[in-house]
């Protein structure tokens, strides 16, 4: 389908004598103006510089046209602007704003890398390098909040939660997951909440096969996060929240050894229903009166 182009738009304002005219007929035009803000944020955080330092460039130096940092920036900013497929590189090669995000002159700068170059770059990254990349992202997030809160936090809550990432095709390690009723990956997502703030901050994601158990990779991730968080916030208490898929003596032992407060969901059973009988009746009455879902909290002793 042909693209409909608007060559000119005129804006009339009540309190202005002259109209404002916007024209779109320049050769160096782009639809991704938000990329400039992302570039400014990256300049402040120096994130892509740090990520590039995690990668080893094994290419012949005499044949390099695009540095590792340039390739990384091109891919990251492209993804952030909605260009998931490396095939988009062909039409973005001379986009002025995408060249600007890489650090090139938006008009006279050299064209960006092609799809084959980006594909070779992605496939050359080793598992060890991927670990270093994830660790660098997590440390950048922690350092940002350490600066924001001046290293002072009374309580930090770590939420660990598996989620589905549906797949479409023959990607490696994609499996059918009965709980989500789809073929997918099952990444483990970690977020941080500081003190009584309502915002949850993404700090790490571990990509896993679609049939992974909920706890797969969680122990190592939790230990790494606690190590860095305790160094950044030495006076903080820690709370870990996980759902029922983590319930089990092995995981509870890990939480005890890490000396953290924890909240673990449990699958319903006859004994728990009996213990919660009075509270369930109270919640039912409140819900019937209000017409909304109501939450009632209580405590009990329970040993499986």
Regions found by a protein language model. Give the residues of each.
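A conserved hydrophobic secondary-structure block that centers on an alpha-helix together
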Residues: 228-229, 234-242
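Dynamic "connector" segments at or just before major functional cores
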Residues: 1-213, 217-232, 255-258
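Structural preference for beta-strand elements that scaffold enzyme active sites
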Residues: 155-159, 237-241, 261-263
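Acidic, metal-coordinating catalytic cores used for nucleic-acid/nucleotide bond scission
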Residues: 240-248, 268-271
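A short acidic (Asp/Glu
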Residues: 169, 248-254, 273-277
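An anionic, glycine-rich sequence signature occurring as long contiguous blocks
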Residues: 4-24, 261-304
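Residue-level signal for alpha-helical context at structural boundaries
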Residues: 59, 107-108, 136, 236, ...
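Active-site loop/helix belt of alpha/beta enzymes
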Residues: 239, 247-261
């Amino acid at each position: 389908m042909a693209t409909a182009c608007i060559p000119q738009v005129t804006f009339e304002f009540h309190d202005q004598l002259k109209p404002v005219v916007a024209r779109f007929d320049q050769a160096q035009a782009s639809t991704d103006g938000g990329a400039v803000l992302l570039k400014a944020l990256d300049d402040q955080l120096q994130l892509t510089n740090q990520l590039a330092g995690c990668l080893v460039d094994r290419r012949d130096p005499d044949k390099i046209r695009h540095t590792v940092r340039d390739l990384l920036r091109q891919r990251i900013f492209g993804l952030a602007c909605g260009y998931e497929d490396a095939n988009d590189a062909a039409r973005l090669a001379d986009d002025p704003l995408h060249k600007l995000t890489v650090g090139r002159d938006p008009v006279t700068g050299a064209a960006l890398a092609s799809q084959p170059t980006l594909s070779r770059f992605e496939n050359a990254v080793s598992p060890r390098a991927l670990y270093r990349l994830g660790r660098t992202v997590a440390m950048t997030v922690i350092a940002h909040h350490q600066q924001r809160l001046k290293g002072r936090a009374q309580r930090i809550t770590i939420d660990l939660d598996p989620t589905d990432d549906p797949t479409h095709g023959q990607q490696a390690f994609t499996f059918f997951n009965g709980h989500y009723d789809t073929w997918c990956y099952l990444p483990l997502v970690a977020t941080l909440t500081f003190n009584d703030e309502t915002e949850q901050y993404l700090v790490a994601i571990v990509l896993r096969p679609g049939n992974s158990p909920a706890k797969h990779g969680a122990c190592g991730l939790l230990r790494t996060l606690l190590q860095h968080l305790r160094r950044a916030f030495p006076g903080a208490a820690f709370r870990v929240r996980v759902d029922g898929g983590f319930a089990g003596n092995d995981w509870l032992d890990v939480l005890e050894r890490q000396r953290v407060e924890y909240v673990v969901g449990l699958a319903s059973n006859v004994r728990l229903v009996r213990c919660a009988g009075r509270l369930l009746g109270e919640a039912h009455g409140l819900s019937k009166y209000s017409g909304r879902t109501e939450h009632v909290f209580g405590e009990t002793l329970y040993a499986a």
